[in-house]
């Protein structure tokens, strides 16, 4: 697994989170990297947030796992901002697509978080599923369940090493 770079935002999060779910999102902006997104959310009140941003070559953490990010809302379903971890995949492929490498890095991060928090595979969901089908996120989730099912099948078989650690910059 890639090292997790940290740029923890002082904005847009709750002081409490009890991770029982993982919500998969996509950034929705073409060619925006994980580092760009972490910097953007670090820079001010954006009225949204996510725990992690993932691209082809890096993973950036923007909100502590123990804090609730503003990524799925609080009242619509059993999954909410205070019991889930939000992961945003960056869109580096054409037409707001997610590359295979970004998807693989996301799989490894999700597997690591599942192991760390005891989250079952059934509790890994897309934002689309959580929102009651009102938010097409990731962009392939509304009309390509085969891709998400394949993502979850891969997830069931991914072996992941723990991320490296060093002087506060990497988890």
What residue spans do the PLM features occupy?
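N-terminal catalytic cores of peptidoglycan-degrading enzymes
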Residues: 1-80
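Basic/polar, cationic surfaces and motifs that engage anionic cell-wall
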Residues: 3-6, 12-18, 90-171
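Hydrophobic faces of well-ordered beta-strands that scaffold small-molecule active sites
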Residues: 24, 85, 124-126
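Residues within well-ordered beta-strands of beta-sheet-rich folds
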Residues: 25, 53, 86-88, 107
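Cell-envelope and extracellular/periplasmic
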Residues: 28, 80, 85-94, 115
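Short, surface-exposed linear patches
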Residues: 44-48, 74-77, 83-85, 107-111, ...
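Short C-terminal domain-edge/linker segments immediately following a structured domain
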Residues: 53-58, 81-85, 116-120, 154-157
